[in-house]
Amino acid sequence: MPRKGPAPSRQLVKDPVYGDVLVSQLVNKVLLDGKKSTAERIVYGALEQCREKTGTDPILTLKKALDNVKPALEVRSRRVGGATYQVPVEVRPGRSTTLALRWLVTFTRQRRENTMTERLANEILDASNGLGASVKRREDTHKMAEANRAFAHYRW
């Protein structure tokens, strides 16, 4: 750890269209090779498709999807006396949001629809309805934490 203490967390910039920090974080997760305008076009197109399909505010749909994907617990490896244990720990709010966005984008890229915009829109809609691979990933993470509950006393 540096002598000056931890680095201060940076203030996130709200995106210009929706005025929401979550959307700008999603744009940054979709971003590849520094092509931000392409990432913005994909995200805004996906949110517009969500609006057309549900008839509701796409930001609310995105927030509901993220709430369904955010993990509350995760396992971290802890080495104790030559054995490595998977120790369940609670996830900090910032990390849970980051993990949710990462999983959403990762499983969006694995989908079979034609365009990235369609894939992202459908993954957001599935996640907001409690379906999809990203929600399954959260459930698997929680199952791992539950299975290793016996090692909870090793946590930091």
Swiss-Prot record:
One of its GO terms (molecular function) is tRNA binding. It comes from the Bacteria. Pfam families: Ribosomal_S7. CDD domains: uS7_Bacteria. The keyword rRNA-binding applies. One of its GO terms (biological process) is translation. Keywords: Ribonucleoprotein, Ribosomal protein, RNA-binding, rRNA-binding, tRNA-binding. GO terms for cellular component: small ribosomal subunit. Gene3D superfamilies: Ribosomal protein S7 domain (1.10.455.10). The keyword Transit peptide does not apply. Belongs to the universal ribosomal protein uS7 family. One of the primary rRNA binding proteins, it binds directly to 16S rRNA where it nucleates assembly of the head domain of the 30S subunit. Is located at the subunit interface close to the decoding center, probably blocks exit of the E-site tRNA. Part of the 30S ribosomal subunit. Contacts proteins S9 and S11. PANTHER family: RIBOSOMAL PROTEIN S7. This is Small ribosomal subunit protein uS7.
